UniProtKB/Swiss-Prot annotation:
Function: Methyltransferase required for the conversion of demethylmenaquinol (DMKH2) to menaquinol (MKH2).
Keywords: Menaquinone biosynthesis, Methyltransferase, S-adenosyl-L-methionine, Transferase
MF terms (GO), sorted A to Z: demethylmenaquinone methyltransferase activity
UniProt protein name: Demethylmenaquinone methyltransferase
Family listed: Belongs to the class I-like SAM-binding methyltransferase superfamily. MenG/UbiE family.
A Pfam family this chain is assigned to: Ubie_methyltran
PANTHER family: 2-METHOXY-6-POLYPRENYL-1,4-BENZOQUINOL METHYLASE, MITOCHONDRIAL, METHYLTRANSFERASE
Catalytic activity as recorded in UniProt: a 2-demethylmenaquinol + S-adenosyl-L-methionine = a menaquinol + S-adenosyl-L-homocysteine + H(+)
Top-rank taxon, per record: Bacteria
Residue numbers binding S-adenosyl-L-methionine: 62, 80, 100-101, 117
Top-level EC class as recorded in UniProt: transferase
Pathway(s) the chain acts in: Quinol/quinone metabolism; menaquinone biosynthesis; menaquinol from 1,4-dihydroxy-2-naphthoate: step 2/2
Gene Ontology BP term (one): methylation
Amino acid sequence: MSRASLEKDPREVATMFDAVGKNYDITNTVLSFGQDRLWRKRTRRRLDLAPGDKVLDLAAGTGVSTEELAESGAYCVAADFSLGMLRAGSHRDVPMICADGLNLPFADNTFDAVTISYGLRNLVDFRAGLREMARVTKPGGKLAIAEFSTPVIPGFATVYKEYLMRALPAVAKVVSSNPESYVYLAESIRAWPDQEELAREIRANGWENVGWQNLTGGIVALHSGTKPLD
């Protein structure tokens, strides 16, 4: 797998995340200066879930995002391709399943909402992933995608890119069990579509009413949409 490329070997991606599962959550909190907690809350609020809703949290990792979603009273399922990540989150009180985001083990029109946080970028074919998420979502159901994006504050983008390519890998060497994975993280973020381009891709792959909210100056963009009724 070329680190700077969006072409990925799914086995390599799974192996990479298996290796970081144990310290994944605390590492992300350190590297994001605690902003990851805010981003999870914003995702839950955007979905506006109700008790009894069925929700799929795709690329859920250790399930920390699924726990946040479940605070709404909805029934939330954590799905991830990495067994290592799921094992690291096995203490969480949410149902977990090992699943391929391009071939989900669920019937059509199963969920009231589907969400994926910082995982769409890691799918071998993210467009196919968007269509697969639409398949398992009920007509009129909701989508939320939290993903690293392009800063919108003038001058900040340069500082952020410097952090991504220099500071983040250096800090990861101290706090992560697999710092190489954070080099991949930095390079994949740089290669990822910006907010408007990703919105176009979401619309073209099964979703409507697509919009986004920039979080922390656009470091993260929270895209949302709905599945058409027909």
